[in-house]
A protein has these predicted regions:
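Histidine-acidic metal/acid-base catalytic patches
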Residues: 1-31, 78, 82-88, 109, ...
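Structural motif corresponding to the early beta-alpha repeats
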Residues: 3, 29-108, 121, 160, ...
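Conserved glycine-rich "GG(E/T)P / GGGxP" loop and the immediately following alpha-helix
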Residues: 13-15, 68-72, 131-133
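Intrinsically disordered, low-complexity segments enriched in polar/charged small residues
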Residues: 43, 98, 126, 188-190, ...
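Hydrophobic, well-structured mid-protein blocks that either form specific transmembrane helices
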Residues: 97-142
């Protein structure tokens, strides 16, 4: 199993100060097997993406695949595929956005567009929104894409379900056949909101969730990595994820 680091884990301020290339090197020093580059944290994509070519396992697009009214956003997909290609990242991660019943017909077009970019595999993540972060929404999407003969995989974010009041264990049991990538994210409840925390500090049943998910797929840290010695902090968390997965 490979352990990756989603570079958002270092925080917007840290990545803005140093850049994602610096964070990528930090992750390498800490023993991570790769990183997920975050589109929303790029300061100068035209310069940063080529500089990280060959160093990223995943490119994460902040854009949804479908607009709020259910139309396939071909421009957003094209931007994501281009960024992943420049990075030489084998995976592009996106959420489904406003996918609904009216969107099913556009899966044929999506399939054709993806066949035109065979070097990049699209994976779908559950985000924190009502349209793209609930179990019914994701079940409906994966059933529809399977019927369309697409075979898309899922990025299962362990923590995001809580933002929509969903049970992560129920989601893991239902969606495990599609999961090809796991975002490890613990959660705690603060007044009026959920926040991401390391798995060891989580109030969620993360061990049971891990047991329900495929063990061999890449697992990424996506919770705050902070401390005076970021390499040491990150190294400890990489080791924690490896041990937690083995124990599950």
């Amino acid at each position: 199993m490979k352990v990756l680091i989603s570079l958002s884990s270092f925080g917007a301020a840290e990545t803005a100060r140093h850049g994602q290339l610096w964070c990528t090197e930090l992750g390498r020093q800490a023993g991570a097997d790769g990183v997920e580059v975050r589109g929303e944290l790029l300061r100068d994509a035209a310069a940063e993406l080529p500089a990280m070519a060959g160093l990223a396992a995943v490119y994460s697009s902040p854009e949804g695949l479908w607009t709020h009214d259910g139309h396939l956003d071909e421009a957003a997909l094209a931007r994501g595929l281009h960024a992943a290609a420049v990075l030489q990242a084998p995976r592009l991660k996106m959420a489904i956005g406003g996918f609904g019943d009216q969107s099913h017909a556009s899966l044929v077009r999506l399939k054709a567009l993806l066949e035109g970019a065979p070097q990049v595999r699209l994976v779908i993540e559950n985000d924190q929104t009502a349209t793209a972060g609930t179990l019914p929404a994701l079940q409906a999407f994966f059933a529809a894409q399977a019927q369309a003969g697409m075979g898309l995989g899922m990025t299962f974010d362990m923590g995001n379900w809580h933002w929509q009041g969903e049970c992560p264990l129920q989601a893991a049991e239902a969606l495990a056949p599609y999961v090809c990538y796991v975002h490890c994210k613990g959660v705690q409840r603060l007044p009026g909101k959920w926040v991401a925390v390391p798995l060891a500090e989580s109030v969620a049943p993360w061990r049971a969730v891990l047991r329900a998910l495929p063990a061999s797929v890449p697992h990424a840290i996506e919770y705050p990595l902070v401390g005076d010695d970021l390499v040491a902090v990150t190294r400890d968390q990489v080791a924690f994820i490896r041990a937690a997965r083995e124990a599950a």
